[in-house]
């Protein structure tokens, strides 16, 4: 049972798993901090989010729906939505999404730092920390960055849940008068 833990960490990078965890925690009103950590493709960046029931904003607030196509997309992504980023390995018979080891180390470090701040009581709100990476390999692969990447001036930004909360979020929107 998730409610028995002091902290939940999801470092799968899988939005479906993260959305399920968020839905479970929010629906059951579990007062357990959850840390989500994920990489962007080809070292383009990384994110760590601290979400706790009772604070503004939740993981579902990171997910948007394209008005034209109806497809879901990640509002936090540095990679422009609608692109195919899967690569195939010849002879391997499988596809994968390319991530670098360096970005994974940065994500792990940000995650540990976030957890330390949680247990020191340094966060009073939910938060997402986003770090821009190098776009060299990304652009050489013919991919395009998102407006979020282009508009983010600082290499690392921290955004409060009060700013990323979505008014019509099915899990946290109504409790904040939205």
Predicted regions and their residues:
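Glycine-rich phosphate/adenylate-binding loop
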Residues: 3-7, 11-178
